[in-house]
Amino acid sequence: MAIKEETEESCGSRAVVASITKESPRQHRMKLEVYGEVLQRIQESNYEEANFPGFDDLLWLHFNRLPARYALDVNVERAEDVLTHQRLLKLAEDPATRPVFEVRCVQVSPTLNGNSGDVDPSDPAVNEDAQSSYNSRSLAPPTFGSSPNFEALTQAYKDHAQDDDSAVNAQLPNSRPMHEITFSTIDRPKLLSQLTSMLGELGLNIQEAHAFSTADGFSLDVFVVDGWSQEETEGLKDALKKEIRKFKDQPCSKQKSITFFEHDKSTNELLPACVEIPTDGTDEWEIDMKQLKIEKKVACGSYGELFRGTYCSQEVAIKILKPERVNAEMLREFSQEVYIMRKVRHKNVVQFIGACTRSPNLCIVTEFMTRGSIYDFLHKHKGVFKIQSLLKVALDVSKGMNYLHQNNIIHRDLKTANLLMDEHEVVKVADFGVARVQTESGVMTAETGTYRWMAPEVIEHKPYDHRADVFSYAIVLWELLTGELPYSYLTPLQAAVGVVQKGLRPKIPKETHPKLTELLEKCWQQDPALRPNFAEIIEMLNQLIREVGDDERHKDKHGGYFSGLKKGHR
């Protein structure tokens, strides 16, 4: 059973997108330096707030409640924006007014690291465009400047377009007015998905995004968008207000997407003593807690902890939900995970043992996977796959996913962190907290998962089906091939923007086997209808394994397929 750690990035949980982790001494020093410079600029500019008693302490409190990344990214030349963030976070404390937001027009430059790239300043069209942008008034840059991430996204698309003639012909960001929208509200699960969905409803394209969570449970989300035809902001503000009111006026049964508007402190009081799991009367999953022995903590996340232990003398993994963090949404996912896993029986899917559905001891028990996750093997232990072992892992995953799809189960969060290895070097699919049984119509609309691995149709909140898992599988294959984190130079939201609007994909190494390159490109097609299903993927992998040759199928005599992982545990 996999569990999300604090450092993972997911749109399903705010805490993992911008988690407040312990700062290093270097980060703390840099935060202090930025704080000092912002304070000095505010005082020198004679802002009214600078005269408030204890303002310097309040400003430091503002920086200290936000992660170090906020201080490192903020444009110190725009000290007034820090005051805006302070004000919004204060207003967000009132349930009657949140979510609160601010809108302003900004100018985004296309220059990359001080170079104009392909932009020719002598081009009359460029000059005309620049004149039309600047004539009326001088616009300020975004709060976080023309950030390295935004520049990286632009450059990455250029590189991608040069390497791939079939790249999506999307327009690169140019020097034109855009709008910066800053939201603040109570911190809630899936908040980022809800905000991006609302912006999408207004026809706005997110070009840059910065998401922060405060240590005391609030959010600060800054989006740079285009798609609004006018530079003025009042019309956009009115449109945002109407969109918020529209969501608030929806019947309770349709308010799954607007939990960020209110924070119900009484939620825990309404939670049932026992979680109801749908049943057909053919099986039992409730475990005998007296037979469950918890031994060693393996991982800890925002909403649960993973332990190693035994159940009836069998070695097991035990995922325990933290009672103080349990809410109605978590109970739905817990119920769904038990409902799906109790029916799953396949050698490439982690085996479900049972669950305790009685509060406060909510837990799920599965077989223990001794070798941990593929994510840890690649990124923590710096393991490397040879081509034959890579294909073996890819085949294991595709078999597990094919079984799930044959049983109308869409995983929705396929990534290396959810792929586990047992003592026999068999890789299995795990973590069904956000998986769903496909509807009779064959399409689904609820968004979830992890942005770096997520299919474009899911990011855009469009109807989707099992082929969304195929896209995620392609990103997993690329990760196995390179050992790198997908789009590591971008934040998760910026990666999502690139995938949807720029046709961005990870760069395939030139030395990759041509058939593997072909498989990757088929699986991450923008159009889901062009992607193969897992039965077809299995056939392609078997053919590729035969082509690679029998001599590479055997394990390394010293370490097996996962020798890098074994070394990491010495």
Curated annotation (Swiss-Prot):
<dbReference type="GO" id="GO:0004674">
    <property type="term" value="F:protein serine/threonine kinase activity"/>
</dbReference>
<keyword id="KW-0597">Phosphoprotein</keyword>
<feature type="compositionally biased region" description="Polar residues">
    <location>
        <begin position="129"/>
        <end position="145"/>
    </location>
</feature>
<keyword id="KW-0723">Serine/threonine-protein kinase</keyword>
<protein>
    <recommendedName>
        <fullName>Serine/threonine-protein kinase STY17</fullName>
        <ecNumber>2.7.11.1</ecNumber>
    </recommendedName>
</protein>
<dbReference type="GO" id="GO:0009658">
    <property type="term" value="P:chloroplast organization"/>
</dbReference>
<feature type="domain" description="ACT">
    <location>
        <begin position="180"/>
        <end position="260"/>
    </location>
</feature>
<keyword id="KW-0067">ATP-binding</keyword>
<dbReference type="GO" id="GO:0005524">
    <property type="term" value="F:ATP binding"/>
</dbReference>
<dbReference type="GO" id="GO:0005829">
    <property type="term" value="C:cytosol"/>
</dbReference>
<feature type="modified residue" description="Phosphoserine">
    <location>
        <position position="441"/>
    </location>
</feature>
<dbReference type="InterPro" id="IPR001245">
    <property type="entry name" value="Ser-Thr/Tyr_kinase_cat_dom"/>
</dbReference>
<feature type="modified residue" description="Phosphothreonine">
    <location>
        <position position="445"/>
    </location>
</feature>
<dbReference type="GO" id="GO:0106310">
    <property type="term" value="F:protein serine kinase activity"/>
</dbReference>
<feature type="active site" description="Proton acceptor">
    <location>
        <position position="413"/>
    </location>
</feature>
<feature type="region of interest" description="Disordered">
    <location>
        <begin position="112"/>
        <end position="145"/>
    </location>
</feature>
<keyword id="KW-0547">Nucleotide-binding</keyword>
<dbReference type="InterPro" id="IPR051681">
    <property type="entry name" value="Ser/Thr_Kinases-Pseudokinases"/>
</dbReference>
<comment type="function">
    <text>Serine/threonine protein kinase that specifically phosphorylates chloroplast precursor proteins in the cytosol within the cleavable presequences (transit peptides). May be part of a cytosolic regulatory network involved in chloroplast protein import. Does not phosphorylate mitochondrion precursor proteins. Specific for ATP and does not utilize other NTPs. Plays a role in chloroplast biogenesis and differentiation in cotyledons, possibly through phosphorylation of chloroplast preproteins.</text>
</comment>
<dbReference type="InterPro" id="IPR011009">
    <property type="entry name" value="Kinase-like_dom_sf"/>
</dbReference>
<dbReference type="InterPro" id="IPR045865">
    <property type="entry name" value="ACT-like_dom_sf"/>
</dbReference>
<dbReference type="GO" id="GO:0004712">
    <property type="term" value="F:protein serine/threonine/tyrosine kinase activity"/>
</dbReference>
<keyword id="KW-0963">Cytoplasm</keyword>
<dbReference type="InterPro" id="IPR008271">
    <property type="entry name" value="Ser/Thr_kinase_AS"/>
</dbReference>
<dbReference type="InterPro" id="IPR002912">
    <property type="entry name" value="ACT_dom"/>
</dbReference>
<dbReference type="Pfam" id="PF07714">
    <property type="entry name" value="PK_Tyr_Ser-Thr"/>
</dbReference>
<feature type="binding site">
    <location>
        <begin position="298"/>
        <end position="306"/>
    </location>
    <ligand>
        <name>ATP</name>
    </ligand>
</feature>
<keyword id="KW-0808">Transferase</keyword>
<keyword id="KW-0418">Kinase</keyword>
<comment type="similarity">
    <text>Belongs to the protein kinase superfamily. Ser/Thr protein kinase family.</text>
</comment>
<feature type="binding site">
    <location>
        <position position="319"/>
    </location>
    <ligand>
        <name>ATP</name>
    </ligand>
</feature>
<dbReference type="InterPro" id="IPR000719">
    <property type="entry name" value="Prot_kinase_dom"/>
</dbReference>
<feature type="domain" description="Protein kinase">
    <location>
        <begin position="292"/>
        <end position="545"/>
    </location>
</feature>
